[in-house]
């Protein structure tokens, strides 16, 4: 898990398992992964600080799952993917961009609530701006339409990222296993670390400046995803665990009754993050103006809210049930890594 610069190239590079490597075609590589592991994947994780609303960390993450006796094969395949992927294959690179664009187009239509809420938060949140699906989609459209003009610059950027991401200084390893597996992991890490690059010179963190906009996006659909967002820390309020209960109250009372039952939307959501980012969003909603009026009524609803002990107990139980869920080893590892990165300062604060 390593820091990266802000670039659409990083999202394209997540598909590195989809290109030929030194020893395998991308189809053969996929077969080897399936034979020896439970999968190898890469993603970009964005971790807002719980202490500073303007601070965040971005990590390029490579993950795998494997049985103990298959850990050497898993490590070998990860090294094959990270250090020998052929990113000079322009034909394959174009195919990946076109595939990404097509899949993202479907995702935008099917998960409009997530797209809308994130986009609304980009107006004030740097972390949300990193995750903005619409900007990435627009970039992919541009890359596909002007691939011949951009391919050399894109390939150069991908190569630059390989040497700046996979460095010894940036390496952070999270392992979830029993003690028997830890010694095997340590042995494989001793082979892996010498292959990493040395950090060269002073690194520059890409600066994101949120811009407040007034916009809407049209889709080939008869329904809407209506979002409102803001940051309560920017207005002098701190995060409190009671906000988790408020989320349940809103979704099962005020928003549910007004947007789902009376308004006819398929769903409604809200969220309160520890960095202060907050959103309200409707799902497959036939209304725009009415839903916005309902959002306007939220402060008055909270000010006048009353509930007896029985109802509050139900809300609290509902809150805990969302938090206290069984976790498999993979989920436990994700949780522990997130807890570390959400609370630790970003690299630019430690330099």
Regions found by a protein language model. Give the residues of each.
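Single conserved hydrophobic/aromatic residue that forms the stacking wall/gate
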Residues: 2-9, 13, 342-350
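M16/MPP (pitrilysin/insulinase) zinc-metallopeptidase core fold and M16-derived inactive scaffolds
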Residues: 14-74, 249-255, 262, 271-272
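M16/insulysin-pitrilysin zinc metalloprotease superfamily fold
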Residues: 18-24, 54-107, 190-197, 270-327
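A glycine-rich, aromatic-flanked flexible loop/lid motif
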Residues: 46-53, 214-228, 260-277, 284-295, ...
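Scaffold signal of the M16-like zinc-metallopeptidase fold and its non-catalytic homologs
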Residues: 104-168, 323-344, 348-351
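Generic recognition of flexible, low-complexity loop/linker segments
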Residues: 156-164, 170-172, 214-216, 255-256, ...
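An aromatic/glycine/proline-enriched structural segment found at the starts
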Residues: 172-232
